[in-house]
Amino acid sequence: MSVLLIAEHNNKEVKPFTQNAITAASQIDQDLHVLVIGKNVDEVSKSISEVPNVKKVIQVDNEIYENFLAENYTPVIIKQSENYSHIVCSANTFGKNLMPRVAALLDTSQVSDIIKVISADTFLRPIYAGNAFATVKSNDKKKCITIRPTSFDPAPSTGGSAEIIKVDGSEATTLTKFIKREEVKSDRPELGTARIVISGGRGMQSGENFKLITSIADKLNAAIGASRAAVDAGYITNDHQVGQTGKVVVPDLYIAVGISGAIQHLAGMKESKVIVAINKDGEAPIFSVADYGLEADLFEALPQFLEELNKLNTIQK
């Protein structure tokens, strides 16, 4: 029994969530191999080979994989899957796009978004927006699994010395064609991996008022998030959305401002290490998960908070 993990990267560096997925995959079985598909990915393969618990790195390098099309990735994974009992990857946009295609072609039932490995065939996963948990046992000979990366600690980046093997890929698909990629460039930490996140909700009342959050985020070197209500109201773009239909975050510090705390939002942030809530409604559900709560008008509290941060005259790194 061996595990094949699909690495996520940008052709230059390994994406952080791959390290978390390695931790989870190694709990399934210690015979862990990692598949790296991309263009000019020698450095990516080398980096992964140095991760403890990784026994082998399989590299498929071709320009047709430069833009990470799931339609091009899938035939490669199917081709390499023959000798593996488990095919795994992260349960983010990358994995959610890729793994259902793999599972369908392998005619196996996918086990999605696991948060705990109970045994090689049994896993724990959240249901009902995280308000309940299901223990799932898979009887399939070959198991396709996506892992919620925030539920596992990242694997160390050094200490290993895995073998790197280069193999051929498959022909490019003609069903889809890459057109272009639009990326939002920001000096802020990435929302999904930031140590500190400050999010605003419908209580911000307008996009202009999000400048209050921006000023504090600058001081804390924090990522900016938002509830779905704030996004739907047009206060901020949807790439900032935290929750069941947005990003799942587990920062060291999560500050919720003007967010009532609908279960869909809580599903995306309630595993944060420390949660601070600021809301003038003392009955808001957000206070039920908060470690620290401030019942106050955010338009009075945030300027005072910023004033205190300015007195410190420091920016967190």
Regions found by a protein language model. Name each.
Residues 1-317:
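N-terminal glycine-rich FAD/FM-binding segment characteristic of electron-transfer flavoproteins
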